[in-house]
Regions:
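Residues that mark the junctions of alpha-helical repeat units in TPR/alpha-solenoid scaffolds
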Residues: 12, 52-55, 59, 92, ...
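Residue-level recognition of tetratricopeptide repeat
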Residues: 21, 61, 68-70, 101
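Amphipathic alpha-helical segments of tetratricopeptide repeats
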Residues: 38-48, 85-88
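Pro/Ala/Gly-rich low-complexity, hydrophilic intrinsically disordered segments
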Residues: 88-113
Length: 113
């Protein structure tokens, strides 16, 4: 039985995304970032309902996850770009929360009195 190229691509994006989630849970932000970027290169748009196999769907937010990883790595401008992109595709509370944290991190700090 042969699998189609589309099925193989679907499998790969999901594997990369799952791998990214595992690295994120471990706090390995750099490896999570690599995995999420690989996933996004195959399936670009953030969505609440992404088909993975047959009738199975997942919540798929690669740009949000990339933004969170950049935030954790203190690369705030890149985080802002990815989180904004995620919100342009599909709003999520998590993306909004981290975008607010990014804005706070980028805000000019007032010197102590």
């Amino acid at each position: 039985m042969q699998t189609s190229a589309a099925t193989q691509a679907r499998s790969k994006f999901y594997n990369y995304y799952t791998e990214g989630n595992e690295f994120m849970e471990e706090g390995d932000w750099e490896r999570a970032l690599e995995a999420y970027k690989a996933s996004a290169s195959l399936e670009w748009e953030d969505t609440k309902k992404k088909r993975i196999y047959g009738t199975r769907f997942i919540k798929y937010f690669p740009h949000r996850q990339i933004g969170i990883a950049y935030f954790q790595l203190k690369e705030y401008h890149k985080a802002k770009e990815e989180l904004s992109l995620s919100l342009a595709y599909k709003e999520s509370k998590e993306a909004k929360k981290f975008l607010q944290k990014v804005e706070e991190a980028l805000a000019p700090k007032e010197p102590p009195p």
